[in-house]
């Protein structure tokens, strides 16, 4: 049976994630409140952030930045693209 969540990003009930996608309390919060569809949106947005800011995800500062952006994306005012970002 598919697990459903009230997705904070989409504002509606949708299919939930199969397991927490991130460690710790933030991962648990995402698991309980974010749908698969919204998680896929985040992955696309995160890829854009990594590319545009030329981040190296294994570096602690980059991980901290991405974690903050992830929390804003789902539970804050959102995460925006860099000022000069031009989608293709």
Curated annotation (Swiss-Prot):
Membrane-spanning parts: none
Alphabetically ordered keywords of this record: Iron
GO terms classed as biological process: cellular response to oxidative stress
UniProt keyword Nuclease present: no
InterPro entries: Fe_traffick_prot_YggX, Fe_traffick_prot_YggX_sf
Gene Ontology CC: cytosol
GO terms for MF: iron ion binding
Gene3D superfamilies attached to this UniProt entry: Fe(II) trafficking protein YggX
Signal sequence extent: none
Pfam families per UniProt: Iron_traffic
PANTHER family assigned to the protein according to its UniProt record, in alphabetical order: FE(2+)-TRAFFICKING PROTEIN-RELATED
Entry function: Could be a mediator in iron transactions between iron acquisition and iron-requiring processes, such as synthesis and/or repair of Fe-S clusters in biosynthetic enzymes.
Family of this protein: Belongs to the Fe(2+)-trafficking protein family.
Protein name: Probable Fe(2+)-trafficking protein
Naturally occurring in which organism (per UniProt): Alkalilimnicola ehrlichii (strain ATCC BAA-1101 / DSM 17681 / MLHE-1)
């Amino acid at each position: 049976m598919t697990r459903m969540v009230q997705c904070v990003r989409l504002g509606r009930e949708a299919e939930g994630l199969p397991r927490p996608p991130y460690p710790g309390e933030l991962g648990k919060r995402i698991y309980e409140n974010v749908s698969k569809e919204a998680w896929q949106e985040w992955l696309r947005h995160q890829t854009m952030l990594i590319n545009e800011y030329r981040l190296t995800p294994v570096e602690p500062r980059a991980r901290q930045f991405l974690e903050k952006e992830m929390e804003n994306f789902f539970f804050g005012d959102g995460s925006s693209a860099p000022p000069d970002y031009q989608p293709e």
